[in-house]
């Protein structure tokens, strides 16, 4: 089921129509994702560069104080990014969230592809602006800690992203979310920050392929990059399927009327 504005019921994978790509609502949603992702990545990656500038060593993020500072920047940055985009695009701000919504039938493939393009471009634009504004500072990006293998990192990314997308579904997508939708940006932001505290020392806690892609491209750091795509997509896809098919009753699969801070068009 869909409407002219792109509101979709879940539980049915849909490719979408070619004209959907040029629909004004789709274009507005893609622009929203571009800007929101840029806001988030600028704050998140900027916090890492800031610590490196203060202490002349990016390894300071491995200290307790540095880790808390970076986690806080991620949490606040994402909360704001989701808040400013959720009523326009659903506030995905993350290709993995879009993938979870895709497998759950909440967005068409056409819209998902446009979201992915907008998110990646937003991340690259934010990282380029950071490099220009900081006098050419090379973004540190993401890397695996000593002793952490590719398989460990994929599992860690999958688990963290599963929880993140599950929280997104519960606070943004679930038709019975009620007033819980008003705290959706804070809920997902806090969980992101908590996961950075939990996973940061091991693999940087990506959970967002766009967040990883921007610094990787601008800083040209590609080692283990595939880990930060495979893990989040596995976790997000599983979260979308679990919440959509096990926790949302069939009768509630059709989106209800608009509520504050909950998207009418995602």
Swiss-Prot record:
GO biological process, one term: water transport
InterPro entries in the cross-refs: Aquaporin-like, Aquaporin_transptr, MIP, MIP_CS
Sequence intervals crossing the membrane: 29-49, 66-86, 109-129, 153-173, 180-200, 228-248
Domain notes: Aquaporins contain two tandem repeats each containing three membrane-spanning domains and a pore-forming loop with the signature motif Asn-Pro-Ala (NPA).
GO cellular component: a single term: membrane
Organism (species): Zea mays
Pfam families to which the protein is assigned, alphabetical: MIP (PF00230)
The keyword Metal-binding appears for this protein: no
NCBIfam families cross-referenced by the UniProt entry: MIP (TIGR00861)
Cellular compartments annotated: Vacuole membrane
Gene symbol of the encoding locus: TIP3-2
Signal peptide limits: none
UniProt superkingdom: Eukaryota
Motif NPA 2 in this chain: 208-210
Function field: Aquaporins facilitate the transport of water and small neutral solutes across cell membranes.
PANTHER family noted in UniProt: AQUAPORIN TIP3-2-RELATED, AQUAPORIN-8
Entries under CDD domains matching the protein: MIP
Keywords: Membrane, Repeat, Transmembrane, Transmembrane helix, Transport, Vacuole
PROSITE patterns in UniProt: MIP
Protein name, as recorded: Aquaporin TIP3-2
Topological relation to the membrane, as annotated: Multi-pass membrane protein
Motif placement: NPA 1: 94-96
GO MF annotation, one: water channel activity
Keyword Repeat: yes
Family named by the database record: Belongs to the MIP/aquaporin (TC 1.A.8) family. TIP (TC 1.A.8.10) subfamily.
């Amino acid at each position: 089921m869909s409407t002219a504005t792109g509101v979709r019921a879940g539980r049915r994978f849909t490719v979408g129509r070619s004209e959907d790509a040029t629909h004004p609502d789709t274009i507005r949603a893609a622009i929203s994702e571009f800007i929101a992702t840029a806001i988030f990545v600028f704050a998140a990656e900027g916090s890492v560069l800031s610590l490196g500038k203060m202490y002349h060593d990016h390894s300071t993020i491995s200290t307790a104080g540095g880790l808390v500072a970076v986690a806080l920047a991620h949490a606040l940055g994402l909360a704001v990014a989701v808040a400013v985009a959720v009523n326009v695009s659903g506030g995905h701000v993350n290709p993995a969230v879009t993938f979870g919504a895709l497998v759950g039938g909440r967005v068409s493939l056409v819209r998902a592809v446009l979201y992915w393009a907008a998110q990646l471009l937003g991340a690259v634009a934010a990282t380029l602006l950071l490099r220009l504004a900081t006098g050419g500072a090379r973004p540190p990006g993401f890397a695996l800690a000593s002793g952490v293998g590719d398989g460990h990192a994929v599992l860690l990314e999958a688990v963290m992203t599963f929880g993140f997308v599950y929280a997104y579904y519960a606070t943004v997508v679930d038709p019975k979310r009620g007033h819980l939708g008003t705290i959706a940006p804070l809920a997902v932001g806090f969980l992101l920050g908590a996961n950075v505290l939990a996973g940061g020392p091991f693999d940087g806690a990506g959970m967002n392929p766009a967040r990883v892609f921007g610094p990787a491209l601008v800083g040209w750091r590609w080692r283990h990059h595939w880990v930060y795509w495979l893990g989040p997509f596995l976790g997000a896809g599983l979260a979308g399927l679990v919440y959509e098919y096990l926790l949302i009753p069939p009768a509630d699969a059709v989106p209800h009327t608009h509520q504050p801070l909950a998207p009418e068009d995602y």
